[in-house]
């Protein structure tokens, strides 16, 4: 699984292979194995490249798992962040994706379970 994370010090690892989603896609296409997949991290792709739906559609056949988080700050999914999850999740569902979506955010609220439940509801399109 190729992880689409950035190379900035606080957001990834120096010299990481897949600092842009296009690199992860190129590696998967070059390797040509059903066992090589992309961990499509919506938070990181938004920071690196933006245009989440288009980038997802370009590499959907290679996506093995999806992560969410609010941007900025990797906070919970709410109306205080820039990623509008319902249309993104609809596009992912309409593409035929049947895999898991992992919510990988850092909740600010005291009730962490309620925050997770809110994220699940927001993404359950």
Label each region the model flagged.
Residues 18-125:
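Histidine-acidic metal/acid-base catalytic patches
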Residues 3-6, 35:
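Asparagine-centered polar/low-complexity signal
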Residues 1-4, 102:
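Short beta-strand segments at enzyme active-site cores
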Residues 5-16:
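Surface-exposed cleft-lining segments at the edges of enzyme active sites
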């Amino acid at each position: 699984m190729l992880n689409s994370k950035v190379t900035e010090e606080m957001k990834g690892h120096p010299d990481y292979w897949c600092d842009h989603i296009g690199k992860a896609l190129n590696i998967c296409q070059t390797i040509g194995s059903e066992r090589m997949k992309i961990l499509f991290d919506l938070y990181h792709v938004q920071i690196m490249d933006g245009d989440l739906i288009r980038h997802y559609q370009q590499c959907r056949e290679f996506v093995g798992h999806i992560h969410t988080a609010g941007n900025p700050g990797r906070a919970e999914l709410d109306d205080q962040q820039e990623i509008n999850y319902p249309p993104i999740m609809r596009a992912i569902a309409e593409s035929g994706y049947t895999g898991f979506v992992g919510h990988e955010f850092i909740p600010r609220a005291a009730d962490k379970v309620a925050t997770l439940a809110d994220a699940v509801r927001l993404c359950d399109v």
